[in-house]
UniProtKB/Swiss-Prot annotation:
Residues 1-66, 107-188, 243-263 are annotated as: Disordered. The modification N-acetylserine is found at S2. Belongs to the troponin T family. SUPFAM superfamilies: Troponin coil-coiled subunits. Residues 247-263 have a biased composition (Basic residues). GO terms for cellular component: troponin complex. It comes from the Eukaryota. Residues 1-26 have a biased composition (Acidic residues). This is Troponin T, fast skeletal muscle isoforms. The gene is TNNT3. The keyword Glycosyltransferase does not apply. Residues 56-66, 107-149, 177-188 have a biased composition (Basic and acidic residues).
């Protein structure tokens, strides 16, 4: 219920109370005297003349004063309600301001923490970069010293070692050439697989074809590996036979000669 409705309700109650008081007063004034008791017929007595009792005049009820007091009371209550409302509103505004201040303070603290964290990360990255540069410099210096030592060692060695290095470089070049040739041949054999235009059946056929081809390659690889094993075994066997034959021939030659002559 609003404050205005409370005031109107209070005025209505006040008017009803005043109206009831007036009705009670009128009833007291106009109340008729009780009828006289009927005397018995046998004995007739003289009738007494009855008059309405007079109401003593006392203090008159001032309804205007009552209404003013009631209105003043209602105004005081309304003013108290208004004051309490504004007091609650003031407290809410103070709490809102305090909340905003706490939020701003927390935001500033978080920004400060992020700034400190960023500075520490920057210092860490700079320290890592310095350590990396120092290690690279030390590695380069050590490598230069090793190269200088190698050059001095090579210069102190004779031309035989230089020719040996030249031959080693030549062999390395041959190996590199053979490796490049192998890569080239494999690149020519290994053609790109174009299957974008194939449907499901053709893809299934293509997969089966590739599987068969892979199975054949694995079979050939296994056969070649077995052939290499057999060849190695045969070579080792032949070498052992040659070594045994050479040993026997040396022993037989030593026994056949006596004093540099044959027996």
């Amino acid at each position: 219920m609003s404050d205005t409705e409370e005031v109107e309700h209070g005025e209505e109650e006040y008017e009803e109370e005043a109206h009831e008081a007036e009705e009670v007063h009128e009833e007291e004034v106009h109340e008729p005297a009780p009828p006289p008791e009927e005397a018995p017929e046998e004995e007739e007595k003289p009738r007494i003349k009855l008059t309405a009792p007079k109401i003593p005049e006392g203090e008159k009820v001032d309804f205007d004063d009552i209404q003013k007091k009631r209105q003043n009371k209602d105004l005081i209550e309304l003013q108290a309600l208004i004051d309490s409302h504004f007091e609650a509103r003031r407290k809410e505004e103070e709490e809102l301001v305090a909340l905003k201040e706490r939020i701003e303070k927390r935001r500033a603290e978080r920004a400060e923490q992020q700034r400190i964290r960023a500075e520490k990360e920057k210092e860490r990255q700079a320290r890592l970069a310095e350590e990396k540069a120092r290690r690279e410099e030390e590695d380069a210096k050590r490598k230069a010293e090793d190269d200088l030592k190698k050059k001095k060692a090579l210069s102190s060695m004779g031309a035989s070692y230089s020719s040996y290095l030249a031959k080693a470089d030549q062999k390395r070049g041959k190996k590199q050439t053979a490796r490049e040739t192998k890569k080239k041949v494999l690149a020519e054999r290994r053609k790109p697989l174009n299957i974008d235009h194939l449907n499901e059946d053709k893809l299934r056929d293509k997969a089966k074809e590739l599987w068969d081809w892979l199975y054949q390659l694995q079979t050939e690889k296994y056969d070649f590996a077995e052939q290499i094993k057999r060849k190695k075994y045969e070579i080792v066997t032949l070498r052992n036979r040659i070594d045994q034959a050479q040993k026997h021939s040396k022993k037989a030659g030593a026994k056949g000669k006596v004093g540099g002559r044959w027996k």
